[in-house]
């Protein structure tokens, strides 16, 4: 079944344009509520959000929609996406709802859902909700309407959960860490997590005004973090995105480390402690150098489709624990049910503290292959798959690279973009091939 509203990470778009409107949010919540009530007499849902100004409007609309379907609501306020996932499970709620467009700018927003177990829901559930949206509403009678309350200590509960994933015998004392929360959902949480574990913390990107989320800060704009680490002679820098489910890190020299590298550090740390790591799941975008390095250490590597939900599905199929994406969505399923930027950063810092090595030293034998990623904006109705010029350009690039590189061309699941990725042993070759493919896509 083709889904009308749900993309790879919930429902997302520009605020005020369908489907990110208050009337749709109310209808959506009502439809979800009806689906929940098919199996539960009195469901409870948790609603968290990031710091976009539109979050207030969408939160109110969702609350009304759920209440009108006979569903109780617990408001969490600004909270990272993984924090909502954790509290949904900890509070024994029926469902978790996150209002966020993750790394997108403030004019965008989105709505995504977590199961009672704190995991992202399968396509089949989203299809059931879309089918319910096509039916006329059935309002609960007055005696059956849902109620709403606020969980005032949601942030504190999540802070303690994050800290519990860091080894009790270790501390961050003596480390100076710059924390960039992207003016997003972790602005009041991330600095406290690292401070309470002993670090000296310098916070940037922690002053949201409703309009500045992800603006020139955070995991998608790490230049500000690099500058702050160098200027303040910090040991590490940690950049989250708007909903804090992804992370990038910087060392004392100002070198940036992406999710592929951080995933390798997490795996290597377990191997160093003689823990069994049978396999790791990456994506079609994961750097070949990481795959080769893991295989040299006897760790199987599998590629899932791009998107942390697909990494999670493959991990569950294989009964493995570790996976992630270069964007910084990292999964350690014995620590959390979903990708968590804060917990991932803590796992990496734990590896550094325990080994006495820097990130650069831990990654000395994993030099990444040059990887070029270009975004080509698609026109409405443009079918890139039937573009013969593009097909020829892709075929030519693959022939040139042979076994020493990769080409991946795919449509974004959240924006009207065609993503072109080329990986090669030489940067100049990767750039040249990627540019040829992007030019061919624009010509179509």
UniProtKB/Swiss-Prot annotation:
**Any one GO CC term of the record:** cytosol
Task: Report the enzyme's class at the first EC level.
Answer: isomerase
What are the record keywords, sorted? Answer: Isomerase, Magnesium, Metal-binding, Phosphoprotein
Q: How is the cofactor bound?
A: Binds 1 Mg(2+) ion per subunit.
Q: Does the keyword Ribosomal protein apply?
A: no
- Its EC number is 5.4.2.10
CDD domains recorded for this chain?
GlmM
Q: Which reaction does it catalyse?
A: alpha-D-glucosamine 1-phosphate = D-glucosamine 6-phosphate
- Keyword Metal-binding carried by entry: yes
Active site at: 102 (phosphoserine intermediate)
Supply the name of the protein.
Phosphoglucosamine mutase
Q: To which species is this protein native? A: Acidovorax ebreus (strain TPSY) (Diaphorobacter sp. (strain TPSY))
């Amino acid at each position: 079944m083709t889904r009308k509203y749900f993309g790879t990470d919930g429902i997302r778009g520009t605020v005020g344009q369908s489907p990110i409107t208050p009337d749709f949010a109310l209808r959506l919540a009502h439809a979800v509520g009806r689906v929940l009530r098919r199996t539960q007499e009195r469901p409870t849902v948790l609603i968290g959000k990031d710091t976009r100004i539109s979050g207030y409007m969408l939160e109110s609309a969702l609350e009304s929609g759920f209440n009108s379907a006979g569903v109780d609501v617990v408001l969490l306020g600004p909270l990272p996406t993984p924090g909502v996932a954790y509290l949904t499970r900890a509070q024994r709620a029926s469902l978790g709802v996150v209002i966020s467009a993750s790394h997108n700018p403030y004019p965008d927003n989105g709505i995504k859902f977590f199961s009672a177990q704190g995991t992202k829901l399968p396509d089949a559930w989203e299809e059931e909700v879309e089918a319910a949206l096509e039916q006329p509403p059935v309002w609960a009678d007055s005696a059956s309407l849902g109620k709403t309350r606020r969980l005032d200590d949601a942030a504190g509960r999540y802070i303690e959960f994050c800290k519990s994933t860091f080894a009790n015998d270790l501390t961050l004392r003596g480390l100076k860490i710059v924390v960039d929360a992207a003016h997003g959902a972790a602005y009041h949480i991330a600095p406290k997590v690292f401070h309470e574990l002993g670090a000296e913390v310098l916070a940037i990107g922690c002053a949201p005004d409703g309009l500045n989320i992800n603006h020139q800060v955070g995991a998608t704009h790490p230049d500000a973090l690099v500058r702050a680490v160098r200027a303040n002679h910090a040991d590490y820098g940690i950049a989250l995105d708007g909903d804090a489910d992804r992370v990038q890190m910087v060392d004392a020299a100002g070198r940036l480390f992406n999710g592929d590298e951080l995933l390798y550090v997490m795996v290597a740390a377990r191997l160093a402690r003689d823990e069994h790591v049978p396999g790791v799941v990456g994506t079609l975008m994961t750097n070949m150098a990481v795959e080769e390095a893991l295989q040299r250490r006897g760790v199987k590597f599998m590629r899932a489709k791009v998107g942390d939900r697909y990494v999670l599905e493959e991990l569950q199929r294989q009964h493995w624990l570790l996976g992630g994406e270069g964007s910084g969505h990292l999964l350690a399923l014995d620590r959390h049910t979903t990708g968590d930027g804060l917990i991932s950063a803590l796992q990496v810092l734990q590896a550094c503290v325990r080994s006495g090595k820097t990130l650069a030293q831990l990654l000395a034998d994993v030099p990444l292959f040059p990887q070029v990623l270009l975004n080509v904006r698609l026109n409405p109705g443009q079918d890139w798959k039937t573009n013969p010029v593009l097909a020829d350009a892709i075929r030519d690039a693959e022939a040139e690279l042979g076994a020493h590189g990769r080409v991946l061309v795919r449509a974004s699941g959240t924006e009207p973009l065609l993503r072109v990725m080329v990986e090669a042993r030489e940067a100049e070759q990767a750039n040249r091939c990627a540019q040829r493919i992007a030019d061919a896509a624009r010509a179509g």
